[in-house]
Amino acid sequence: MSTTVYLQKDREKSLLRRHPWIFSKAIDKVKGKPEAGEPVDIVDQRGKWLARGAWSPDSQIRLRVWTFKQDEQIDTEFFVRRLQQAQAGRELLISRLQLSAYRLVAAESDLLPGITIDRYNDHLVCQLLSSGAEYHRHELISALQQLYPTCSIYERSDVAVRKKEGLAERTGLIYGEVPPDEVIIEENNGIKISVDIKGGHKTGFYLDQRDNRAIAGRYAKDRRVLNCFCYTGGFGVYALQGGAKEVINVDVSESALELAKHNATLNKLDLTKARFEKQDVFKLLREYRERGEKFDMIVLDPPKFAENKAQLIGACRGYKDINLLAFQLLNPEGILLTFSCSGLMTSELFQKIVADAALDAGREAQILERMTQAADHPIATPYPEGYYLKGLVVRAI
């Protein structure tokens, strides 16, 4: 017998607008004893059917909606349909940019809550981030094997958010051959990037910054470029290819810097124009300021400063500080590419922080372009939380 979850009075409005989350406080009563991740029927206070979703007893997000169709069951064929729909939405992008790596599934924005899948050549890398995704693991994997029989499937569910769902972290091979230590992908019509699927950040690489790396390349010609929080050097590769006279890549990770150097070599770029600094970015930028160093272009792509609302005020201070330092280091007519990857940081707030940083640095500044996540990271219209990556191209006059 299926479980039915009744909502509090007037708490169905978000579902009527097709938002995929229901929080614990919106629930009136539960008829049945669902397992973690089990699909349940969601009804309003009068019993009118609204949606079918996954039960997450350990999360504040108590329900994640799978479907708004009452006759649609959550089985292997359901996942086949969702995956086919996701793949179809990316075909034009793959063809236009000659991609060998892309995000196949962007969780809620692809109507598959808690599931992220990236494809690197013939390797599918999955993150199962919710109780519902875990509960339907077998059906999801069966659907992937049916649609992508020649691809290996590797799991990278080693993320802290699983703890909020009462799930342990997990990584390892699910199907096929273990990915090699180095997987070389191509993007934007020929740029090569070395990816560490088993040990790299996220699923191995930041595919969401693909378009913005290309933008960086377009501004780099004849500029001295400082690439902060460089990770494996993607922005630096594009800057060198775009004609930068010097690129300084900065990260705290020695292994990331080695991979950044390798990525420059893969693309046959002139390493005499590149430096790789193992440093704390905040500390190094202050040292540069004291020494009077100047740059023509700075890229700020920091890690997420705010994981929850309680951390947002501190995150604002961090973004303000790092952007202030950047403005102080830029030559006249310098270009700043600055990003926030926190979903809690609105575009308006981020722009205000950058504006305040320019003001405190005594610089006139203009926004030339706004940047966001690449098109294989879509944002479902009822789900604004899917919009997480914000970026600005700023001219410091």
UniProtKB/Swiss-Prot annotation:
Q: Which residues form the PUA domain?
A: 2-81
Q: Which SMART domains match?
A: PUA
Q: Which reaction does it catalyse?
A: cytidine(1962) in 23S rRNA + S-adenosyl-L-methionine = 5-methylcytidine(1962) in 23S rRNA + S-adenosyl-L-homocysteine + H(+)
Compartments, as annotated in UniProt: Cytoplasm
SUPFAM superfamilies associated with the record: PUA domain-like, S-adenosyl-L-methionine-dependent methyltransferases
Gene Ontology molecular function, alphabetical: RNA binding; rRNA (cytosine) methyltransferase activity
Q: According to the UniProt entry, what is the EC number of this protein? A: 2.1.1.191
Protein name, entry field:
Ribosomal RNA large subunit methyltransferase I
Organism the protein comes from: Tolumonas auensis (strain DSM 9187 / NBRC 110442 / TA 4)
